[in-house]
């Protein structure tokens, strides 16, 4: 039997977007492997993965996990969050990065105000999608998703059966498969 992580990777590599149903403590340890699968080495220039988090603290903890896990392949992982200096964060992104981790609102603001290039994006991850929707991030996520090139999308949620959630996800994640922790 395949593990939750292996099942998600298999579907993503086949070009299908994935809705992962699990708690953060179940998927956070797997995020570095998802990133490494699509951003295997450092390159100059544009981001190749975006990770959208609900809160500043979530973004900081995911950033820390990714920094440790990708140290050996020397990926540049930039952290952008609401309480940080927008000017410093913008300058960091202009210097080039492989992965951007941050709050949904700040990533969206920086993207639309400063236009970092998403042309090479390979992986778009939204964490705690159900909570992000209930906290008013729906519009930010939709605007980012509409701007993306064809890339793999990975959405994590705990409550996938809510009708408003299902309808919203189908707007921009297609085709998709659902993978649940057993």
Task: Kindly give the residue locations of the regions a language model identified.
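Conserved catalytic network of the ASCE P-loop NTPase/AAA+ motor domain
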Residues: 10-13, 40-45, 69-73, 91-95, ...
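Conserved nucleic-acid-binding Ia/Ib motif block in the N-terminal RecA-like helicase ATPase lobe
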Residues: 44-102, 106, 121
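Conserved nucleotide-binding/hydrolysis micro-motifs of P-loop NTPases
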Residues: 26, 55-59, 84-86, 106-108, ...
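Conserved pre-motif I regulatory segment
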Residues: 1-26
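Conserved beta-strand segments of the P-loop GTPase G domain that flank and frequently precede/overlap
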Residues: 21, 51-54, 80-81, 101, ...
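Conserved SF1/SF2 helicase motif Ia
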Residues: 17-21, 31-62, 74-75, 148-152
């Amino acid at each position: 039997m395949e593990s939750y992580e292996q099942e998600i990777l298999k579907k993503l590599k086949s070009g299908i977007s994935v809705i992962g149903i699990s708690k953060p403590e179940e998927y956070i340890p797997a995020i570095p492997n998802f990133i490494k699968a699509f951003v295997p080495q450092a390159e100059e220039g544009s981001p190749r993965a975006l990770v959208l988090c609900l809160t500043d603290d979530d973004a900081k903890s995911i950033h820390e996990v990714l920094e440790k896990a990708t140290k050996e392949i020397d990926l540049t992982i930039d952290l952008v969050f609401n309480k940080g200096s927008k000017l410093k964060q913008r300058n960091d992104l202009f210097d080039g990065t492989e992965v951007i981790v941050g709050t949904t609102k700040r990533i969206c603001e920086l993207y639309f105000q400063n236009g970092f290039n998403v042309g090479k994006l390979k992986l778009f991850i939204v964490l705690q999608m159900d909570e992000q929707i209930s906290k008013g991030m729906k519009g930010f996520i939709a605007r980012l998703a509409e701007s993306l090139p064809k890339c793999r999308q990975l959405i994590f949620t705990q409550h996938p059966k809510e009708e408003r959630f299902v309808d919203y996800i189908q707007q921009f994640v297609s085709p998709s498969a659902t993978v649940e922790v057993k």
